[in-house]
Amino acid sequence: MNACATFAFSATMAITARHVNAEATTVVKRNPTPAGPYMAQVVGLQWLNPLQRRDYPTEWQLLWTLELVKPNKDDDIVRTKPEKYSKLQAVGSIAVGNGGKETFKGYHHKYIEELIYAYHDIYFMDSNYFYNAHSRDDRLTWRELAGIHIEYALPEGKLDPVEAGNYLRDIIINTFSIGNESFPNAWTRSTPPDVRITMGGANAGFTSLSAALDYLQAHPNETVWVMNWDAPSRPKDRQINENMVQLILAGPNYKTERAPLAWLGYPASAKVADFDSGKDKPPRVNQAWKAAVEKAAHNAGKQTTDVGYVIHDANNNASTAPGPIAALARTVTEEVPELDFVKQSFNTPALLGEMGAGTALTNVALGIAYVNHIGKTVLVAGTTNQAQPIATVVVPPAVVRPIRPDEPWFRARGENAAHLAWWGIRHDVKDKTQGYSR
């Protein structure tokens, strides 16, 4: 058996999958330190969705979705095709669906390829890139992807979790020549990626996030990826409710040489059935929401009154939306009386459509963009399981980067930076062009 085959065999045995029901939530596990609750720094993130223009950076795409930025004033494409590019809608495919003929598995494979292949060239060409194996003279500058731990949330019942995890692992091994004896200068460790799959619905990403934080606590000298993907409208092609999200996280003391984009604490949930009803008590669902929000804020070292914005998944068009929205809105209004829920909240599926297993981390990614530029703490709320609401809190970095509305955004005109991750600004580089990060 050759080396690559050996790696593939051993890695296959390591793929694990946890199944949660379609609206499952995480079981929170926390080991608080004397200094406060455990939190991870967001080193970088990537988001793929057909609404994105390839020549604008990930950072801009998230802010565009939140209606916080516009295309550059000199954008010739907007000028020539305003009906297509001046409003948020699908503008291109991430994965080619062949008119709906592509299988769900094949569609998933294409998303993985688009995400991972984008890192290949810069990984081997730039010693300053966060993940790299560039310099042959000084391998101390390397940060290899060998052995990367990945927590990945996928839709229940639509994919084989073992096959999906194996495919992601093998794409990473092959793309970065991990353990490939034909390219001995491309790696120093042959450890395959460690992929853990969570199968579920809209809240599955919260489970993956909690598992990632558990891993970082146990492995403070490593980084971790948290991912989710779904395309709920398949076999329709190019729908804006398709989302692949990759969060790149590190522990609080990990030296990234970059400013964090944001900080994340553990998600928190509460079961409605655990609360009593009575004429002198609020409805049990409101009690559960109050407990979940308070715990999520505590897990992020915050008070509920620190929340300045809410991102949630209670689609206004869904038949069950009035209940979840009402319960969440009442809780936020009572816990954060200075926050206007109507004006200071974002209903993602009302804009993008129901997002399935892609919901939780897409909302977290939007929250990261908001806190990084606006500076207000964001509550990300999962409303789809009315028996067990869940929430997590996204905390701004120490230095907020205000949007500069009169300045242009970086554009990958030659697409050399298309679909690359958004990173925190390096400490040794001045923040020049909005949207440029390596």
Regions found by a protein language model. Give the residues of each.
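Conserved "HGTGT" condensation-loop signature of ketosynthase/thiolase-family condensing enzymes
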Residues: M1-N241, V245-R438
